Amino acid sequence: SSAASDVYKRQEHPEENIERIIYRSLRVKKNVVENDEHEQGQRACLNFGHTIGHGIEAVKGVRGRRTNGLFHGECVALGMLPMIEDKSLVRRTRAIYRTLGLPTRTGVDKNKVLSYMQHDKKSTGSTITVIKVPGLGCWRADKIPMTELPALLGIKENED
């Protein structure tokens, strides 16, 4: 959508627009929560990045409690990257992270993240629900087999 594109263009120079970006983001989140108070539909989009993000957070630790830890938002931001299916959008998102001084790599053992994710509250035994973004301004909730998690995390089949 053109509205999503405008927001994204503004975020490519976040230092010039940070207050507007934060205000608009909070307004959007508030509307989503108010329109889906019981998490029956649209509110699921707010889980974008959290499934992998919580795994990163569990392994890396939270800044303040662990010296080299990351903030919750940094973990979620890193967890968003593998969920973006459009590679050019991944590159643009990484560029924005760099501009904001956010990490673009986790620096953690992906197998440890995988192990944590296999016990995530959004998992139901052999499947887990993740939020994927096929392109700018659109998302979908996917129930994927746990066996797809290694590939999603970029773990090679024979990697230990």
Predicted features and spans:
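Short, small-residue-biased leader/transition segments that mark boundaries at the very start
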Residues: S1-Y8
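A structure-centric signal for secondary-structure junctions around beta-strands
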Residues: A4, Q42, G125-T127
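Short, solvent-exposed coil/turn linker segments
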Residues: K9-R10, D36, W139, P145
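Active-site segments that bind and position negatively charged phosphate/pyrophosphate groups
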Residues: R10-N111
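C-terminal charged capping/lid subdomain of soluble metabolic enzymes
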Residues: R91-D160
